[in-house]
A protein has these predicted regions:
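Long, internal low-complexity/basic segments
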Residues: 70, 75, 81-82, 90-100, ...
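C-terminal cap/loop subdomain of S1 sulfatases and analogous C-terminal strand-loop tails that border
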Residues: 1-105, 109-111
Length: 172
């Protein structure tokens, strides 16, 4: 995600992200896209110690937003409850009615909800974490106004494949 703007900055194009937002012509083709990537070159070269990426969004293979991370915090919106094995591909993600919160500095393996008897008390005490997470997710979603998703994620669901074939869309 961050490699494209970083490598292009190293090659002399430090503002590719901004150029692509307004339309950037390469050869005889113009590209106008939202690139969710950051130029990490100043961080890698030691010019700065500040990471330009303030948040990170996690998506599953169905293109569903499952979690987001900012600073030390991670908010989980959906869970894959199957543990390991290929079975994870046959079982659906579970949408949570209330997101789970993890402090990645104190709980890097995100196990407090399983190993602590007082996790949900702690969650209520840290509900303020939801406010910035809503802002970051809202910022991302707002990019869809000018840059809507170009394609639907591939599906192993036979009903969806059949529907796409009936609509004349062929296969994924």
């Amino acid at each position: 995600l961050d490699w494209m703007p970083t490598l292009l900055a190293a090659a002399g194009v430090p503002d590719i992200k901004e150029k692509l937002l307004t339309g950037y012509t390469i050869g005889n083709r113009t590209y106008k896209v939202h690139l969710d990537g950051f130029n990490m070159l100043p961080l890698l070269t030691g010019e700065t110690t500040k990471d330009p990426r303030e948040s990170f969004l996690y998506f599953n293979d169905d293109a569903q937003l499952t979690a987001m991370r900012y600073d030390n915090w991670k908010c989980v919106f959906m869970e894959q409850r199957v543990q390991g094995t290929m079975k994870i591909w046959s079982e659906p993600f579970v949408t949570l009615r209330i997101p789970k919160i993890f402090n990645l500095r104190t709980d890097p393996f995100e196990r407090a909800d399983v190993t602590s008897n007082t996790y949900y008390d702690w969650l209520l005490d840290h509900a303020f974490i939801f406010v910035p997470s809503q802002v970051y997710v809202g910022q991302f979603i707002s990019t869809f106004k000018d840059f809507p998703p170009r394609q639907k994620a591939a599906s192993f669901n036979l009903d969806e494949v059949m529907q796409k074939m009936q609509e004349g869309g062929g296969s994924n």
